Amino acid sequence: SDLTKLKMRMDTIPVSIAIAQAANESGWGTSRFALEGNALFGQWTWSKKGISPKNKSKNQKHKILQFQILKASVKAYKNNLNTHNAYSEFREVRAQLRENDEQITGLLLTKYLKNYASIGEKYVKILEDIIEKNSLTDFDKANLLPTKLKDGVAL
């Protein structure tokens, strides 16, 4: 049903995956794309405002999508994983984990991101290594406390 599809596309992305992908794609936030365009996830564009990679071949016309603020980069990343056909299996497995009341973790789902980069399975291994070496699975279990506001300022 449409509601089932919508639920699959609105579910969470494990924090460990988001951190690992941002770290890998942006060189831990030090890449030219991150510094000049708030581009943490290396998303390509062919029509929107973007930054041209310096080492691309002449037949490659893509740019790296750039953003005014980091939050917009994260939002575009979430939208990409939650809607693009290349990640449908990622969403299906995540939905199955949710249905079975199992924990949704980065290490369980990284294998479904081989289409994110041209290096495929090697990319999955890189993400798994980043997650494991930096204990990022700890963040998959974290729950943020609600923000308390006083006069519109977070305390």
Residue ranges and their predicted role:
Residues 1-20, 24-155:
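Catalytic cores of secreted/periplasmic lytic hydrolases that degrade extracellular macromolecules
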